[in-house]
């Protein structure tokens, strides 16, 4: 009896997590009004330091699964994809540095600060490629195990053109 109850509980939790799954598109739909006019710039990695951007990037970074529920960066979710784009020890250093710099910030500011730190780091170009690839995978525009390629750039351009024009 206990095992059946335990199994039902686990299944219910799993379904709840699936129902809560987010995408960048969902985050953009509920982004604060103050950012709506800047969506194109934000999608092109313009960095903003406002409470509304903190809220938006918290949603986005959680949707992409790059940060934990408390907004702290998740080293293990990014190191392998970064090294798949460019094998370099700098990624380890930058993930550690950005994680360390942001982990003691207020919870609502962590994800945006982590994002900004990575974009501005020497891993920035590789991070943007990982970010775009994962965004497309989460939106089901690419298969789950996809890696960065020129297809990512083409799909992102198509999405950005639709949003920005």
Curated annotation (Swiss-Prot):
It is found in: Secreted. It comes from the Eukaryota. One of its GO terms (molecular function) is odorant binding. Female salivary gland. Not detected in female carcass without salivary glands. Not detected in male tissues. InterPro entries: PBP/GOBP (IPR006170), PBP_GOBP_sf (IPR036728). Serotonin binds at residues 28, 56, 115, 132, 135. Residues 1-21 form the signal peptide. GO terms for cellular component: extracellular region. Keywords: Blood coagulation cascade inhibiting toxin, Disulfide bond, Hemostasis impairing toxin, Secreted, Signal, Toxin. The keyword Amino-acid biosynthesis does not apply. Pfam families: PBP_GOBP. Histamine binds at residues 115, 132, 135. Its main location: secreted. Disulfide bonds join 27-59, 40-164, 98-117. The keyword Metal-binding does not apply. Belongs to the PBP/GOBP family. Modulates blood feeding of female mosquitoes on vertebrate species by binding and sequestering different mediators involved in the host response. Binds serotonin and histamine. Increases blood clotting time. This is Short form salivary protein D7R1. The lineage of its organism: Eukaryota, Metazoa, Ecdysozoa, Arthropoda, Hexapoda. The gene is D7r1.
């Amino acid at each position: 009896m206990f095992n059946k109850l335990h199994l039902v509980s686990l299944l219910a939790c799993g379904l709840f997590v699936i129902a809560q799954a987010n995408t960048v598109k969902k985050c953009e739909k509920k982004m604060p009004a103050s950012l709506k006019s800047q969506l194109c710039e934000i999608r092109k990695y313009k960095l903003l330091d406002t409470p509304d951007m903190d809220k938006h990037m918290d949603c986005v970074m959680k949707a992409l699964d790059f940060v934990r529920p408390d907004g702290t960066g998740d080293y293990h979710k990014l190191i392998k994809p970064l090294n798949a784009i460019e094998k370099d020890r700098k990624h380890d250093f930058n993930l550690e540095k950005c994680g360390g710099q942001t982990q003691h910030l207020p919870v609502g500011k962590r994800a945006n600060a982590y994002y900004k730190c990575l974009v501005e780091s020497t891993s920035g170009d590789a991070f943007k490629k990982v970010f775009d690839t994962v965004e497309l995978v989460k939106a089901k525009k690419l298969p789950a195990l996809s890696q960065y390629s020129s297809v990512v750039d083409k799909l992102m351009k198509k999405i950005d053109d639709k949003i920005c024009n």
